[in-house]
Amino acid sequence: LPEEYGGMGIGFMAQAYMNEILAWSPLSNRLFGVIAPNSGNQKVLLKYGSEEQKKKWLEPLIAGEMESAFSMTEPDNAGSDPRSIQTTARKEGDEWVINGHKVMTSNGIKADFAIVMCRTEEEGEDGEVNSRMTQIIVPTDTPGFNVIRSVPIWGHTGGDHVEIKYENVRVPVENQLGARGTGHAAAQDRLGAGRVFHCMNSIGQMWRAFDLMLQRTITREVHGGKLETKQLILSLIHISEPTRPV
């Protein structure tokens, strides 16, 4: 985040490295506010949000006064292809009316609002395929925002991924995030960087596991000596990290 929003103003590479360092502790990402989907939603709100939206949604999100969700993936479409989504938003007067079915919506149980990827143009309408999607901010207490169930994720506890049905969800047009048709671009802005940051988180968790393993090796007594004296154990450590002295 920029310094005016309380961030450090660091670039992409520095943030990627910080994700690796912070991931060494299981609690540091939440402590420092570098946790999905809030961090990704902050980025999108910062780039595409109006000043009113930043005041209403971004600033409380940064302050920890709100939680957010990101709602794009659908049960019948490839989650990695935002152009294939079928959830629609139709303009009626000064409102968007949203209907659709989402799954794997991250942080969906605790969220105060969700950023929802919607199809706002049909196949036969004018416009390039990447300009048919729009992201819309939906407060989770809006009538028709129906959480169906939590979706368990292997190896990931406490993430609150949920399945949601949007049934005639009405929000003001002011909740449109960015210009109409910029939803795909906004998704790529957040998902491209997010994939790298998630990878760096995994690397940080790997280093924590490796360091804990080293600690165990130099303290565990077995068969008349420490594990660090066993050739097989040393070989496994060498294979795992040949560049760091044991």
Language model features: what each stretch is:
Residues 238-246:
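Single conserved hydrophobic/aromatic residue that forms the stacking wall/gate
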Residues 86, 95, 99-147:
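A short core secondary-structure module
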Residues 64-73, 117:
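A short, Trp-centered hydrophobic/proline-enriched beta-strand micro-motif
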